[in-house]
Amino acid sequence: MFITGAFFDILEVGPKKIRRCFELVRVRFAPSPTGHLHVGGARTALFNWMFARKEGGKFILRIEDTDTERSSREYEQQILESLRWCGLDWDEGPDIGGDFGPYRQSERLEIYREYAEKLVEDKRAYYVVYDKEDPSKELFTTYEYPHEYKEKGHPVTIKFKVLPGKTSFEDLLKGYMEFDNSTLEDFIIMKSNGFPTYNFAVVVDDHLMRISHVFRGEDHLSNTPKQLMIYEAFGWEAPVFMHIPLILGSDRTPLSKRHGATSVEHFRREGILSRALMNYLALLGWRVEGDEIFTIEEKLQSFDPKDISNKGVIFDYQKLEWVNGKHMRRIDLEDLKREFIEWAKYAGKEIPSVDERYFSETLRICREKVNTLSQLYDIMYPFMNDDYEYEKDYVEKFLKREEAERVLEEAKKAFKDLNSWNMEEIEKTLRDLSEKGLASKKVVFQLIRGAVTGKLVTPGLFETIEVLGKERTLKRLERTLQFLKKT
């Protein structure tokens, strides 16, 4: 809750109760730009974003690019673009700045060096000098900067001194956690190349950026005791930690490429709506009351991080598609049209120029049969293109039948004589045709369906023909008859 603009919480840490006050909820998402945005990272960003927005706080984006070999600005831009597509905006970050920047770790090296040297001054860290020929071999340690050895080319790092005792904290999901310091050795906080290690950089950054809560994957749980030791060495108050169970594959191991696609970029390209992806990711671990199909904005005020499950959840690709299909049929037709056009441009798909009303009507009937924008494009293709191809199954199972030509000729004649072009009259015409004994109803309907679309699976046949219109339907029947005569 907020009292005079401050966020308070009370934690029980073992036998002690600690009351902490934060001027403002400040959370961060800090990806490493070494690849595309993983759906697990997107879910972590979502939970942080929802907490900040509900509590009137700030959501900070920080780029952790200290892995100089794997990090790239290209991946950074892709991550930012994926976050924007997900509908997640930030209040401070590398692209918009803020009061606590820079927001790229590679631009904060001098800050880390100064704080590491402060720990050396306080005897909580020390320099380590290594052999020039064998950089893995430690020569000696010292509290004085080894200028002479550094100038001679010896690698020099700074190590943090682990003190005896225990380190504990209260995790919002996992409860009281305690670690025996004897299980940890002194660890490097500044590498020989002048870059900080992960555990040191995040502590300095989170403190200086006034981060109040750290919500992250439980794969970071083992890092927490080291980070808490650094907080203690500086005399800083640690943020509230919450370690979220990982998203799992079907074999209950952490979701990875061996299970299938894992990047936000992939699902975007495949035609998943951003609102559907966020809906599904929210369902992965968050206990939501009511309808499971929703937009994040609809559920924002009911979000409580304590409602997140402490168990791992399996990523179900089919469930994601199902959720997406529900959203495609739920949203306003004009919104779907806009999203479809934007997706086609992103995926490199060409949409032919057609009448606006015809396009909308096609979209209306086709969205009922599919679950992704990619599938929507495929099913709409013959509506948008007169040079569609005939599916092999249509040709082999129906068009090569002896009665095919006569059925199509009769259909062409019946539609030509039809004065009122509406679904009721079209249905009556086709049912009358199927009762003439030319072929079974299924064969008649599938012959005509394939003739006007090239496909055996389409929206309802009567709707399809109504939307195609009389002129287009007659032309397509004639086109198929000409194709039949050539085969």
From Swiss-Prot:
A motif ('HIGH' region) lies at residues 31-41. ATP binds at residue 257. Keywords: Aminoacyl-tRNA synthetase, ATP-binding, Cytoplasm, Ligase, Nucleotide-binding, Protein biosynthesis. It catalyses: tRNA(Glu) + L-glutamate + ATP = L-glutamyl-tRNA(Glu) + AMP + diphosphate. GO terms for cellular component: cytosol. One of its GO terms (biological process) is glutamyl-tRNA aminoacylation. It is found in: Cytoplasm. Its EC number is 6.1.1.17. Its main location: cytoplasm. Catalyzes the attachment of glutamate to tRNA(Glu) in a two-step reaction: glutamate is first activated by ATP to form Glu-AMP and then transferred to the acceptor end of tRNA(Glu). Monomer. NCBIfam families: gltX_bact (TIGR00464). PANTHER family: GLUTAMATE--TRNA LIGASE, GLUTAMATE--TRNA LIGASE, MITOCHONDRIAL-RELATED. Belongs to the class-I aminoacyl-tRNA synthetase family. Glutamate--tRNA ligase type 1 subfamily. This is Glutamate--tRNA ligase 2. The lineage of its organism: Bacteria, Thermotogati, Thermotogota, Thermotogae, Thermotogales.
